[in-house]
Swiss-Prot record:
EC nos: 7.1.1.-
Protein family according to the UniProt entry: Belongs to the complex I subunit 4L family.
Lineage: Bacteria, Pseudomonadati, Myxococcota, Myxococcia, Myxococcales
Swiss-Prot/TrEMBL GO biological process terms: ATP synthesis coupled electron transport
Protein name as catalogued: NADH-quinone oxidoreductase subunit K
Keywords: Cell inner membrane, Cell membrane, Membrane, NAD, Quinone, Translocase, Transmembrane, Transmembrane helix, Transport, Ubiquinone
Residue stretches spanning the membrane: 2-22, 28-48, 60-80
Species per Swiss-Prot/TrEMBL record: Anaeromyxobacter sp. (strain K)
Gene Ontology cellular component annotations, sorted alphabetically: NADH dehydrogenase complex; plasma membrane
Quaternary structure note: NDH-1 is composed of 14 different subunits. Subunits NuoA, H, J, K, L, M, N constitute the membrane sector of the complex.
MF-aspect GO terms: NADH:ubiquinone reductase (non-electrogenic) activity; quinone binding
Catalytic reaction(s) noted: a quinone + NADH + 5 H(+)(in) = a quinol + NAD(+) + 4 H(+)(out)
Function (record text): NDH-1 shuttles electrons from NADH, via FMN and iron-sulfur (Fe-S) centers, to quinones in the respiratory chain. The immediate electron acceptor for the enzyme in this species is believed to be ubiquinone. Couples the redox reaction to proton translocation (for every two electrons transferred, four hydrogen ions are translocated across the cytoplasmic membrane), and thus conserves the redox energy in a proton gradient.
Predominant cellular place of this UniProt entry's protein: membrane
Keyword ATP-binding among record annotations: no
Length: 99
């Protein structure tokens, strides 16, 4: 399969993630959209690694997956803490720094 197909798929995934970040106000949806954008970036790294035959793209993708897992765990913990204290996870309704 040509590498361009992977790049088009990555662009579509990144666009869907960006659309979710720009239009949704639910914190969980925002986190999922950011994860989708990170996976699109990983797919791009892997596509270029496949084209060049280099393993650096695979190493970068593995590192990004590890960082994304840590980011998701911390983000989910923050969302749960905010929900327990405020009763909402909508980013427009929650103003953590003002109180």
């Amino acid at each position: 399969m040509p590498v361009e197909y992977y790049l088009w798929l990555a662009a579509i995934l990144f666009g869907i993630g960006l659309l979710g970040v720009l239009t949704k106000r639910n914190a969980l949806i925002l986190m999922m959209s950011v994860e989708l954008m990170l996976n699109a970036a990983n797919l791009t790294f892997l596509a270029f690694a496949r084209r060049s035959g280099d393993l650096a793209g695979h190493a970068i993708a593995f590192f990004v997956i590890a960082v994304a897992a840590a980011e998701a765990a911390v983000g989910l913990a923050v969302v749960i803490a905010i929900y327990r204290s405020r009763g909402a996870i909508n980013v427009d309704e929650v103003r953590v720094l003002s109180e």
